[in-house]
Amino acid sequence: MEFNEEFYVALGFVIFVAILLYYGVHNKLNAALDKRADRIREDLAHAVRLREEAAALLASFEKRKAEAEAEAEALVAQARTEAEMIAKEAHERLAEFVQRRTQQAENKIANAEAQAMAEVKAIAADAATKAAEILLTDAAKGAYGQKLIDQGIDGLKAAAH
């Protein structure tokens, strides 16, 4: 019987497999593969948990974001309302200030007019007095003037008694 190299390779392979089976390498391989499969399952379960936690965090952050946006909108609305109230109050104060200034100016103008009228009346009275003095001085010269003086003295005596 002649054996060729293929026979020896096949015989070596069968012996090799028999040795592996004798030492239980297949059990160790199965155990290693099972261990690897369990670790992969754990990793997948952990990944699923992480994904769920991430989804929960995302939902929480989106809720917080919505709350923050609503709060920001409320703050903006409140600030806008306060700004409008401040502007309205400033406008009212300005209107009151303008009204007071206008009233003060009108009062000053009225006082100036009254003072000017008083000065004009005083000047007119002085002018009338001077004119009357000049007229009376011219008219009171001589006997007529003496007669007026006597009448004035008699009037004073009568008023005194």
Swiss-Prot record:
Its main location: membrane. F(1)F(0) ATP synthase produces ATP from ADP in the presence of a proton or sodium gradient. F-type ATPases consist of two structural domains, F(1) containing the extramembraneous catalytic core and F(0) containing the membrane proton channel, linked together by a central stalk and a peripheral stalk. During catalysis, ATP synthesis in the catalytic domain of F(1) is coupled via a rotary mechanism of the central stalk subunits to proton translocation. It is found in: Cell inner membrane. It comes from Beijerinckia indica subsp. indica (strain ATCC 9039 / DSM 1715 / NCIMB 8712). Belongs to the ATPase B chain family. It is a single-pass membrane protein. The keyword Zinc does not apply. CDD domains: ATP-synt_Fo_b. It comes from the Bacteria. One of its GO terms (cellular component) is plasma membrane. Keywords: ATP synthesis, Cell inner membrane, Cell membrane, CF(0), Hydrogen ion transport, Ion transport, Membrane, Transmembrane, Transmembrane helix, Transport. PANTHER family: ATP SYNTHASE SUBUNIT B, ATP SYNTHASE SUBUNIT B', CHLOROPLASTIC. InterPro entries: ATP_synth_b/b'su_bac/chlpt, ATP_synthase_B_chain. This is ATP synthase subunit b 1. The gene is atpF1. F-type ATPases have 2 components, F(1) - the catalytic core - and F(0) - the membrane proton channel. F(1) has five subunits: alpha(3), beta(3), gamma(1), delta(1), epsilon(1). F(0) has three main subunits: a(1), b(2) and c(10-14). The alpha and beta chains form an alternating ring which encloses part of the gamma chain. F(1) is attached to F(0) by a central stalk formed by the gamma and epsilon chains, while a peripheral stalk is formed by the delta and b chains. The chain crosses the membrane at residues 6-26. GO terms for molecular function: proton-transporting ATP synthase activity, rotational mechanism; proton-transporting ATPase activity, rotational mechanism.
